[in-house]
């Protein structure tokens, strides 16, 4: 009988990416892989799109809020139902372990696995824990973290960032689509790539639309999240979504303008790619992106510009400063010790699962 592992995590792409890195490795080693999530969530879309041999189990989900809302009353019942569904799934499958990447959907499966005596491993990417992982930590066997955490968190293993980016641009798959884009770009201009993520692309889209003069100063690549904006014209490539082109576009850019999500930031760090961070503020997030951006700026990896300050004048100043000190930023990024390979983390996780099973 094959070993079984349950994955969970969702709500944003960032809560799915690491799972999609690990899952093929478990499948290759003969594990039967199952995933618990929201059937209407990004996790279901990404699992389906991956084509991986994964059985998806849908549960009811409710948002966990730090503030009062009448929706909390309805969501209490959704979370309770999700817990009952998770208990049934875990009891039926009897997996060796559960791995969670976080997000609201992950809490019921984590609690269910713990109640049924299954080892629970969770991962936190941000400088500070989100509410879902604060709850999940209480039920976890081990929590792996990208950033160092408080000393009193005894179950934490500081890992660093796990990425699968190609550091060598020559390793990346060739793309006829990319060659077509280059035909519209000028070799005399710097190329900027704007990555807004699922929650933050709109501001970048509007900034580019409001300032057509940017196209006279730079080649612009804009990942918009909106298919209605798709365009390929002189000095401008707007595309709603990319997969295979993602890393080649980063490699093609001289500088990346990004939000403050930790997954993207550490991918840029791994590629030693010059970048400007415009983090989501507390009105659009819990403040984790502000913390991530400040961390990267203090480490000398990047420069940050707050969203309310995103004017053309301030943007031009930030570009000038980054390009003037490009060599210093790149040298600092190349010297980082904060990046781990997927194989390293997979081996560590497998070893920890084995140890947890033996200790039961």
Curated annotation (Swiss-Prot):
InterPro entries in alphabetical order? GlcNAc_MurG, Glyco_trans_28_C, GlycoTrans_28_N
According to its record, how does it sit in the membrane? Peripheral membrane protein
Q: Which family does it belong to?
A: Belongs to the glycosyltransferase 28 family. MurG subfamily.
Give the keywords, sorted: Cell cycle, Cell division, Cell membrane, Cell shape, Cell wall biogenesis/degradation, Glycosyltransferase, Membrane, Peptidoglycan synthesis, Transferase
Recorded GO CC terms: plasma membrane
Q: Which domain of life is it from?
A: Bacteria
Q: What Pfam families has UniProt attached to this entry?
A: Glyco_tran_28_C, Glyco_transf_28
Gene3D superfamilies linked to this entry: Glycogen Phosphorylase B (3.40.50.2000)
- The name of this protein is UDP-N-acetylglucosamine--N-acetylmuramyl-(pentapeptide) pyrophosphoryl-undecaprenol N-acetylglucosamine transferase
One MF term in the entry's GO annotations = undecaprenyldiphospho-muramoylpentapeptide beta-N-acetylglucosaminyltransferase activity
Instruction: Please verify whether the record's keywords include Metal-binding.
Output: no
Top-level EC class: transferase
GO biological process entries: carbohydrate metabolic process; cell division; cell wall organization; lipid glycosylation; peptidoglycan biosynthetic process; regulation of cell shape
Specify the pathway: Cell wall biogenesis; peptidoglycan biosynthesis
Main location per UniProt? membrane
Per the record, what are the reactions this protein catalyses?
Mur2Ac(oyl-L-Ala-gamma-D-Glu-L-Lys-D-Ala-D-Ala)-di-trans,octa-cis-undecaprenyl diphosphate + UDP-N-acetyl-alpha-D-glucosamine = beta-D-GlcNAc-(1->4)-Mur2Ac(oyl-L-Ala-gamma-D-Glu-L-Lys-D-Ala-D-Ala)-di-trans,octa-cis-undecaprenyl diphosphate + UDP + H(+)
Per the UniProt record, which EC number(s) apply here?
2.4.1.227
What does this gene product do?
Cell wall formation. Catalyzes the transfer of a GlcNAc subunit on undecaprenyl-pyrophosphoryl-MurNAc-pentapeptide (lipid intermediate I) to form undecaprenyl-pyrophosphoryl-MurNAc-(pentapeptide)GlcNAc (lipid intermediate II).
Record-listed UDP-N-acetyl-alpha-D-glucosamine binding positions: 198, 289
Where does the record place it?
A: Cell membrane
């Amino acid at each position: 009988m094959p070993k079984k592992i349950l994955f969970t995590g969702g709500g944003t792409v960032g809560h799915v990416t690491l799972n999609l890195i690990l899952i093929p490795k478990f499948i290759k080693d003969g594990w039967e892989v199952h995933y618990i999530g929201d059937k209407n969530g990004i996790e279901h879309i990404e699992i389906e799109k991956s084509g991986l041999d994964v059985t998806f189990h849908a549960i009811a989900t409710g948002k966990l809020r730090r503030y009062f809302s009448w929706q909390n009353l309805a969501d209490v019942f959704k979370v309770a139902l999700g817990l009952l569904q998770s208990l049934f799934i875990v009891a039926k499958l009897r997996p060796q372990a559960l791995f969670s990447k976080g997000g609201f959907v992950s809490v019921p499966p984590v609690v269910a696995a713990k109640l049924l005596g299954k080892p629970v491993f969770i991962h936190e990417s941000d400088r500070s824990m989100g509410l879902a992982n604060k709850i999940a930590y209480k039920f976890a066997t081990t929590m792996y973290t990208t950033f160092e955490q408080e000393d009193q968190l005894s179950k934490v293993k500081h890992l660093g960032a796990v990425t699968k980016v190609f550091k060598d641009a020559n390793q990346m798959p060739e793309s006829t689509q990319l060659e077509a884009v280059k035909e519209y770009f000028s070799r005399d201009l710097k190329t900027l790539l704007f990555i807004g993520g699922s929650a933050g692309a709109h501001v970048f889209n509007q900034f580019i639309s409001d300032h057509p003069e940017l196209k006279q100063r730079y080649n612009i690549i804009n990942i918009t999240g909106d298919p209605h904006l798709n365009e390929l014209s002189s000095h401008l490539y707007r595309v709603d979504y990319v997969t295979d082109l993602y890393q080649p576009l980063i490699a093609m850019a001289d500088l990346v303008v990004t939000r403050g999500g930790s997954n993207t930031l550490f991918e840029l760090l791994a590629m030693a790619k010059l970048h400007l961070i415009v983090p989501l503020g507390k009105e659009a997030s819990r403040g984790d992106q502000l913390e991530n951006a400040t961390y990267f700026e203090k480490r000398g990896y990047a420069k940050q510009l707050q969203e309310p300050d995103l004017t053309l004048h301030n943007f031009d100043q930030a570009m000038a400063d980054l390009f003037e000190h490009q060599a210093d930023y790149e040298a600092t990024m190349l010297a980082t010790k904060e990046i781990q390979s997927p194989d390293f983390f997979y081996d560590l996780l497998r070893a920890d699962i084995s140890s947890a099973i033996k200790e039961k």
